[in-house]
Amino acid sequence: IAAGAYDYTLGRGTGANHGNWYLTSSKNTSMPEQDVHNNDLRPEAGTYTTNLVAANTMFVTRLHERLGQTQYVDAITGEPKATSMWMRHEGGHNRWRDGSGQLKTQSNRYVIQLGGDIAQWDWGGTNRWHLGVMAGYGNNHSSTGAVRTGYHSKGSVNGYSTGLYATWYADDETHNGAYLDTWAQYGWFDNHVKGDGLPGESWKSKGLTASLETGYAWKIGEFSSNYGNLNEWYVQPQAQLVWMGVKADELYESNGTLIESTGDGNVHTRLGVKTWIKRLNKMDDGKSREFSPFVEVNWLHNTRDFGVRMNGEPVYQDGTRNIGEVKTGVEGQINPHLNLWGNVRVQVGDKGYNDTSAML
């Protein structure tokens, strides 16, 4: 029997209570105790939480994940022009546990975003502002298992986002020096959850996410290889603040349980440093071709834990207050018409939290 945040089973009493039958939600007591560390949590709590986390995080992006400006020839006039159109694909896998350790959740996601500048202006010199629009689609599929009961639940969230971004470079030609990037997106999502032996539930979530990011890049040295290729070494400290305001609608399950989301309004902080080597191959002279392998290390902090209240009983995601991240990849200009960049990212937190993703 599922009620509130817990699963209950019918069991015979012991000792003097052998002739009585009880609904229990604990290994050690014959009567349920309202304590998430003693009672048997429903796996659906993990699925509700995962959907909320995915809706708040799947469209979070960084400047270098959508950076690039390429040249093309106008088909009508034949004149060379520049375009800032970009597209990013990301796939990821995530694992985490709840605060009691009873629920284990894993999920897989896919996200596509695209956008481009709609205006640019400068204040003289090489500095320049970029104003752009972006939109995206993403989905996340998850499974949660309850360690004590062996019950499982599955969930999914599918959604769209649209928003604006603005970026300033102190040097728009080389992207050295300081930069400032900000964006805001509105997202709306369809959610589903299905527990073992229970009717499926559906609800919607929606809300705003916004970001402010800054950094400073400088060249700390250069060296030549034995083949005469020039290598330039860069370092860039970065900082980013993301406000996450996607909130799920209240839901009454078929059994009457009230489902409320928690954790919206979380402020996600990222502090880190990126270093890369820009390789200028002698064979590519005059071909506008260059490659930059990079490594990035970040510390991530969240001010709130995402979770759910089921008839007022809280269940939350654990291990995400402080997360370490390592990211490596390559950014390259194939020719004047095409830039490509890709990376692999690993995040590790407390209590078994981890996330792995790849982006192109």
PLM feature spans:
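Extracellular, surface-exposed repeat/solenoid domains
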Residues: I1-S26
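Hydrophobic beta-strand residues in large extracellular and virion-surface proteins
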Residues: L23, A210-L212, L271, V295
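Outer membrane beta-barrel translocator domains of Type V secretion systems
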Residues: S26-N226, N343-R345, D350-M359
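Outer membrane beta-barrel transmembrane domains
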Residues: Y160-G163, Q238, G245, S254-L360
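Short acidic/polar capping segments at secondary-structure boundaries
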Residues: Q185-F189, Q240-V246
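Intrinsically disordered, low-complexity Ser/Thr- and acidic-rich flexible linkers and loops
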Residues: F223-G228, M283-D285
